[in-house]
Amino acid sequence: MTNFKDIIKKIEYKFSKHQLPDIKVGDLIRLGISIQESGKQRVQPFEGTVIALHKAGLNTTITVRKILQGIGVERVFPIHASCLTSIQVLRRSQVSRAKLYYLRNRTGKATRLKEKFEKLPPIWVNKLP
């Protein structure tokens, strides 16, 4: 007899993306978002800092913040969503918090994070299926 949790794990594995980069809070990432406008499909980049990571299996989400024309813009992306076509980790930062919500109250140079210099693996650009 199959356990209910085993059935859910099989379904989640079927719909999850397996080639995801290691995303951490404080990373500067570039996401490729597939957008359909007037019958045409294009990929729109969204580049920003990961301020929160909520791990929940197939429902894992990241909150990405960027400053656009002097206004802070935050978007929450489900990592396993079909609209995400690519994820690039551009830079890692050294942070000591799990959530960087304090960046919302800071402006200008105060929003900079200390960069962590580490050797990145050669495959950081992941084209997701």
Curated annotation (Swiss-Prot):
Keyword Ribonucleoprotein: yes
Pfam families in alphabetical order: Ribosomal_L19
CC per GO annotation: plastid; ribonucleoprotein complex; ribosome
Keyword terms: Plastid, Ribonucleoprotein, Ribosomal protein
Superkingdom, taxonomy of origin: Eukaryota
InterPro entries tied to this protein: Ribosomal_bL19, Ribosomal_bL19_CS, Ribosomal_bL19_sf, Translation_prot_SH3-like_sf
GO BP annotations, alphabetical order: translation
Gene3D superfamilies: 2.30.30.790
Subcellular locations according to the entry: Plastid
Keyword Repressor on entry: no
One MF annotation (Gene Ontology) recorded for this entry: structural constituent of ribosome
Family: Belongs to the bacterial ribosomal protein bL19 family.
Protein name: Large ribosomal subunit protein bL19c
